[in-house]
C-alpha cells in the first residue's frame, strides 16, 4: 500500500518467507546483501558505527519511472533488536531525502518468517504529483516481487544452526 501527502510518501507491506527468522533477519541486517536482491540498488554497504555506537549504512539507488530516471543516495544509522526489528533513519545532510525512515518487523508465522515493512520518505528530488503515487506503487510492486524471491533464496542459503 502506497500513499502520499504533500510530497511525503508512505508504504506498508507484509511478506512471508520460507526461511527461519534468523536467516531472514541476517539478509536484512547486512546492507551489502541489498545489491544482490534489488536491481534498483546499485551500491550498498555497512559503514563504521557513529559516535553513539549506532550502525551506519550507505545506499545508492537508480530507477526510472516512464522517461524520468533518477539516482539518489541515503546514508544514516540503524537501530535493531536481533530477529525482532530493524529501523533505518536517513541523515538529511548526507541523503537525497528530507527524511526517509524505514522499519522491518520480523515474526515467526506458519513455519516461516513474516516481515512487515513500513516506509516514510520525503525526497529532495521531484516526483510527478499527479501520477507519482501510482507510478511509485507500480514500480515497487514489480521490483518488490522479484526482490522477495531473491531474499528468500539468499536467506535459505544462510546456515544458522
Protein language model features and the residues they cover:
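Hydrophobic ligand-binding cavity/cleft-lining segments
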Residues: 1-52, 145
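Short beta-strand segments that buttress and anchor functional surface loops
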Residues: 2, 56-64, 87-93
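A generic structural signal for beta-strand entry/edge sites
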Residues: 6-10, 52-56, 83-85, 110-114
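Hydrophobic/aromatic beta-strand elements that line small-molecule binding cavities or substrate pockets
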Residues: 12-15, 44-46, 71-79, 101-108
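Beta-strand elements of well-folded, non-transmembrane domains
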Residues: 17-21, 61-65, 78-82, 94-96, ...
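Mid-length scaffold segments of soluble, non-membrane domains
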Residues: 33-71, 79-80
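Beta-strand/loop substructures that line and gate deep hydrophobic ligand-binding cavities in soluble
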Residues: 91-138, 142
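Short, highly charged C-terminal tails/helix-capping segments
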Residues: 152-161
